[in-house]
């Protein structure tokens, strides 16, 4: 029985005809979120005259997700997940051989990344280097004029420790304010705060902390007005130049030297052709297109890993930013690298709590918080970068060998 005098069928009927809203269902079933999920789905089936059998088939517990990861839940969407690897990584945090979980419906993608992993591992592995690690939020403050905006910006730059103590430490144990980059446009001040966020991707953390900072600034400067918690200079979930240049999340590089014999044997092409394709496709072609993605397909690998591991899928946008370099070494081998300026990932919080996504993180040995905090997310970043390099190498080789269409005919239909 449901809440009040209604039985389950009556609740379904009332949801289907709109008398009970989707978000109200839990109130009628004593807070049972699994039952509420079933009712919403059955009501939708009834209203639309369809069956949602596969959406209703799942193992995760709605009671653990509703109110944290999802609202108005009706079930799940299942995405096939494959694994590529092993990939040998010689990183500062990721050391050893790793398998890469990839959730995708694009045929040939996993096979291509797997081929890249095989070639790179045979070549001795990938060297990964973490260049920077920060999450940003850029509130917007309205000032009387540009000079006042400059004064406020200077005060903020000189009082980061004070703001950490009076604002940030009040709302987070893991967040650390490490810097700020002010932008002034007319009488508008955009403060691009930079935070350390441990193993969390950190958007919730830095958003809450930034709001506390705004309260302190308004107390210090009564003539300015905090207008928006995000002034779009963060920049979150949009293609942009700021993240490409200054970075956001993890800035990471993966590189390798692949001997000529491996390029010819495994990849069926030459270092010269791969370098030529990369230059005229990824660099010249991308420049002509006005793209921030000077690469072949970062987004394919980033997207598949994000979906598998519970990352914020909208941040695939920034993960697609980056540059691939390929050149022939003096010895005639292939040097190849990828630079990712804004890889926004975490191993705790958000979708990483979903059991299947947590298991995908466990495949790489990065589930949950690290000791010390932050080490798991850094390791994860190096693994992602290595996988992206594998994907770039394989696709560039396929294009150079004119095998791309053939591969998609075989595996992608």
Curated annotation (Swiss-Prot):
It is an enzyme of class 1 (oxidoreductase). It comes from Pyrococcus horikoshii (strain ATCC 700860 / DSM 12428 / JCM 9974 / NBRC 100139 / OT-3). One of its GO terms (molecular function) is hydroxymethylglutaryl-CoA reductase (NADPH) activity. Belongs to the HMG-CoA reductase family. Its EC number is 1.1.1.34. It holds the Pfam family HMG-CoA_red. Converts HMG-CoA to mevalonate. The active site is at residues 106, 312, 408. PANTHER family: 3-HYDROXY-3-METHYLGLUTARYL-COENZYME A REDUCTASE. Keywords: Isoprene biosynthesis, NADP, Oxidoreductase. Pathway: Metabolic intermediate biosynthesis; (R)-mevalonate biosynthesis; (R)-mevalonate from acetyl-CoA: step 3/3. It catalyses: (R)-mevalonate + 2 NADP(+) + CoA = (3S)-3-hydroxy-3-methylglutaryl-CoA + 2 NADPH + 2 H(+). The lineage of its organism: Archaea, Methanobacteriati, Methanobacteriota, Thermococci, Thermococcales. InterPro entries: HMG_CoA_Rdtase, HMG_CoA_Rdtase_cat_sf, HMG_CoA_Rdtase_CS, HMG_CoA_Rdtase_eu_arc, HMG_CoA_Rdtase_N, HMG_CoA_Rdtase_NAD(P)-bd_sf, HMG_CoA_Rdtase_sub-bd_dom_sf. One of its GO terms (biological process) is isoprenoid biosynthetic process. This is 3-hydroxy-3-methylglutaryl-coenzyme A reductase.
């Amino acid at each position: 029985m449901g809440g009040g005098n209604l039985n389950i069928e009556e609740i379904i009927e009332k949801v289907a005809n709109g008398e009970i809203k989707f978000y109200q269902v839990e109130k009628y079933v004593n807070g049972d979120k699994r039952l509420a999920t079933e009712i919403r789905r059955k009501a939708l089936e009834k209203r639309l005259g369809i069956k949602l059998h596969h959406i209703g088939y799942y193992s995760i517990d709605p009671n653990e997700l509703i109110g944290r990861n999802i609202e108005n839940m009706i079930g799940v969407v299942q995405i096939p997940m494959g694994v590529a690897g092993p990939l040998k990584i010689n990183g500062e945090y990721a050391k050893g051989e790793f398998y890469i979980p990839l959730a995708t419906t694009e045929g040939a993608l996993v096979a291509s990344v797997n081929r890249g992993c095989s070639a790179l591992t045979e070549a001795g592995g990938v060297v990964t280097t973490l260049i920077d690690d920060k999450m940003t939020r850029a509130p917007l403050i309205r000032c009387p004029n540009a000079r006042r905006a400059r004064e406020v910006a200077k005060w903020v730059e000189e009082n980061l420790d004070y703001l950490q103590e009076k604002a940030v430490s009040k709302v987070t144990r893991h967040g650390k304010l490490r810097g700020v980059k002010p932008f002034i446009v007319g009488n508008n001040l955009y403060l691009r705060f930079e935070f350390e966020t441990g193993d969390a991707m950190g958007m919730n953390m830095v958003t809450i902390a930034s709001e506390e900072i705004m309260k302190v600034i308004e107390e210090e400067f009564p003539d300015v007005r905090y207008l928006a918690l995000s002034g779009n200079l963060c920049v979150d979930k949009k293609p942009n130049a700021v993240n490409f240049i200054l970075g956001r999340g993890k800035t990471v590089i993966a590189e390798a030297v692949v001997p000529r014999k491996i390029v010819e044997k495994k990849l069926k092409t030459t270092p010269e052709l791969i370098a030529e394709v990369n230059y005229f496709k990824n660099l010249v072609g991308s420049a002509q297109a006005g793209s921030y993605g000077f690469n072949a397909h970062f987004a394919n690998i980033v997207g598949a890993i994000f979906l598998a591991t519970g990352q914020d899928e909208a941040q695939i946008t920034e993960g697609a930013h980056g540059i691939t370099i390929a050149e022939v070494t003096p010895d005639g081998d292939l040097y190849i690298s990828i630079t990712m300026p804004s890889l926004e990932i975490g191993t705790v919080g958000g979708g990483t709590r979903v059991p299947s996504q947590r298991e995908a993180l466990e495949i790489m040995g990065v589930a949950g918080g690290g000791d010390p905090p932050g080490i798991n997310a850094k390791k994860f970043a190096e693994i992602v970068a290595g996988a992206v390099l594998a994907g770039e190498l394989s696709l560039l080789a396929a294009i150079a060998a004119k095998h791309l269409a053939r591969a998609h005919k075989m595996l992608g239909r």
